[in-house]
């Protein structure tokens, strides 16, 4: 069961990483837009 659980955890981590990357990119885009508005 443990051997089957390991491969299952890998895609979940990848999905989490992609989600975090998406949030980070949105945050960066927001900062860029705010800087444009301030300028």
UniProtKB/Swiss-Prot annotation:
Organism: Prochlorococcus marinus (strain MIT 9301)
HAMAP family listed in its UniProt record: PSII_PsbL
Function: One of the components of the core complex of photosystem II (PSII). PSII is a light-driven water:plastoquinone oxidoreductase that uses light energy to abstract electrons from H(2)O, generating O(2) and a proton gradient subsequently used for ATP formation. It consists of a core antenna complex that captures photons, and an electron transfer chain that converts photonic excitation into a charge separation. This subunit is found at the monomer-monomer interface and is required for correct PSII assembly and/or dimerization.
InterPro entries in alphabetical order: PSII_PsbL (IPR003372), PSII_PsbL_sf (IPR037266)
Ranges annotated as spanning the membrane: 18-38
Identification of the protein by name: Photosystem II reaction center protein L
Recorded topology in the membrane: Single-pass membrane protein
Cellular component terms per the entry's GO annotation: photosystem II reaction center; plasma membrane-derived thylakoid membrane
NCBIfam families: PRK00753.1 (NF001972)
């Amino acid at each position: 069961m443990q051997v089957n659980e390991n491969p299952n955890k890998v895609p979940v981590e990848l999905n989490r990483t992609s989600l975090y990357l998406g949030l980070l990119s949105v945050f960066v885009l927001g900062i860029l837009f705010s800087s444009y508005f301030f300028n």
